[in-house]
Amino acid sequence: MGDRGGAGSSRRRRTGSRVSVQGGSGPKVEEDEVRDAAVSPDLGAGGDAPAPAPAPAHTRDKDGRTSVGDGYWDLRCHRLQDSLFSSDSGFSNYRGILNWCVVMLILSNARLFLENLIKYGILVDPIQVVSLFLKDPYSWPAPCVIIASNIFVVAAFQIEKRLAVGALTEQMGLLLHVVNLATIICFPAAVALLVESITPVGSVFALASYSIMFLKLYSYRDVNLWCRQRRVKAKAVSTGKKVSGAAAQQAVSYPDNLTYRDLYYFIFAPTLCYELNFPRSPRIRKRFLLRRVLEMLFFTQLQVGLIQQWMVPTIQNSMKPFKDMDYSRIIERLLKLAVPNHLIWLIFFYWFFHSCLNAVAELLQFGDREFYRDWWNAESVTYFWQNWNIPVHKWCIRHFYKPMLRHGSSKWVARTGVFLTSAFFHEYLVSVPLRMFRLWAFTAMMAQVPLAWIVGRFFQGNYGNAAVWVTLIIGQPVAVLMYVHDYYVLNYDAPVGV
């Protein structure tokens, strides 16, 4: 009986072996499962020897898929593995969830858009935008102030010309540059505060233009000073690297760079840092330029529409909770304002740093197009400020941070000095046009110093990135509401909320 059972078992093993050979075209996993099934213990008919379950006959259909023939199903269908959402699984393809988030975002904002239209109607009025720039159609103070900035450009050029030939001493040249740069800061501010016909929006454009001019001429003065110092040491200066061919013939050295053509190219170039030889693109790409111009036009209209249709009603309805000091309503209005404010800020970033600066760079064949880096991946506040506005960051490092380190300042003092400078310009561009000084923008910028330490100390990785996004989404609406509230209190009666 036992011998018969053993013989039967042997025959069954050979049969299982034969099936696995016939199905040899299948994957190795299937062969292992057949082999495991053949040797798995089971009681035979006589109970004196293990009898394996018959292995399934695996075959391939014409499409190459595995099909199961006659026999029992596989005994093993589980293996050691983690759930996909577990960190140990190594799974990282969440594209479908990302698409779901985008769909939910679109649907949520579509509901807000419809709610806004039903509640307020269509508020977009392109003609009204003109009144933001001009009170009197016969008085154009802001454009006149911007045109007058050429006086300071010519003054800086003439100072450098005389320094190059030795007609001025370095001390006298420094004094004249300080006077010129100080006037650049004070002159437009005086116009914005004293001329009644200039509008707040016109003042912002004028002050922004003069602030850019200040940074450019500061860099122009520094680079020419470095060239003179190098010339004194080496008796011959060439700031560019030695190259051969046509590039070598086009390279400019000091003082040959002191021309109006060179200076005005720098004034219009999308950079704040002066060089004697800028990288140049070989040609103007017309299709690329056309795309950027169309983006500029489209996003300009989109920003104006969102401000008129979405932000203005929300801000107006936020005045009464501020007046009544209704904190729960203030928080609700703050969160309601955060969405359109942040969306407009993101659109402005793309419009200015990608569309506008690339369009200007393409026209001037300016080769360095790194106007921003991946600030959206910032895991710290410091990384965000270092990567979202590259022209300003380069200027701060080159003309402020490193000179302070060379003069013996610590890194912490130098960083604080950079934030102080940035805080001054933020307050300058907000308080002067509104003709009120509340220091909200200055305080917000200086608060970035302890905030950077807190985020860097307690938040890492994705949590740090989330903390940066929260400060961007919530922080800006707070400043906007503070200034708008104070401006309405000073100039108008607070409107009653709807």
Swiss-Prot record:
One of its GO terms (cellular component) is membrane. The active site is at residue 426. InterPro entries: Diacylglycerol_acylTrfase1, MBOAT_fam, Oat_ACAT_DAG_ARE. It is found in: Endoplasmic reticulum membrane. The record marks 427 as: Important for catalytic activity. Residues 1-66 are annotated as: Disordered. Residues 128-139 are annotated as: Extracellular loop 1 (EL1). One of its GO terms (molecular function) is 2-acylglycerol O-acyltransferase activity. The chain crosses the membrane at residues 93-127, 140-165, 171-193, 201-232, 285-319, 327-364, 411-431, 440-458, 461-492. Its main location: endoplasmic reticulum. An acyl-CoA binds at residues 385-393, 401, 415, 488. Belongs to the membrane-bound acyltransferase family. Sterol o-acyltransferase subfamily. This is Diacylglycerol O-acyltransferase 1. It comes from Mus musculus.
